[in-house]
Amino acid sequence: MKKKSVIAITVAILLLTLTFAGSCLYVRLTGRGNGVTTVWGSDVEALSDAICKGCKNEREKVYAIYDWVTLNITYDYEFDTEYQYFDIDRTLSTRKGICFDFSNLFCALCRSQNISCYVVDGYDRTDREKLHTWNRVFFDGIWCNLDTSFDAVRKAEGKSLYGFIQLEKYDSQDKEYVITRIY
């Protein structure tokens, strides 16, 4: 009798644990990943191939990807950053996103072409509450800063762009933002 009670209690505890800890279970992602949070599938690789079709070198590929992202994704002013998560499929299906979405999409498209690219998180040097995400990409033997979300907004408004800013190395400090993470 005592043995049956112990088994019943153990099973009950196990079932409760599994019920309430479902989000803690290990889930194998089925995409291709090459960074801390940037994960993508074969559909993103196919899109990257289509964008870069006819490009002869890395520079042309980077600029083609940059142009595609800044012309086809719009800034989502209604996105609730309190519950931010990144999902390339959501960004592509809605054609909207915030800086985090723009940067991770650009990174996935570049990495699909075997182009070294990082996502950079940071905050404004004058306001720690003003968070931002942008990219660093390597082509033609140099690292460059670029900001696809900023440039998408500026293109839509017909204003001058941030563009590509040459860096000494991938982890060079930024003039406007304090870097908190590069991945």
Predicted segments — roles?
Residues M1-S23:
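N-terminal Sec-pathway targeting helices
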Residues T10-A12, F86, K130:
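Hydrophobic alpha-helical segments and their boundary regions
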Residues F20-G35:
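Sec-dependent signal peptide cleavage junction
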Residues G31-S93, F138-C144, D174-Y183:
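Secondary-structure boundary elements
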Residues K53, D67, N104-S172, Y183:
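Hydrophobic/aromatic-rich core segments of domains that either
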Residues K61-I65, R95-C110:
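Active-site nucleophilic cysteine motif
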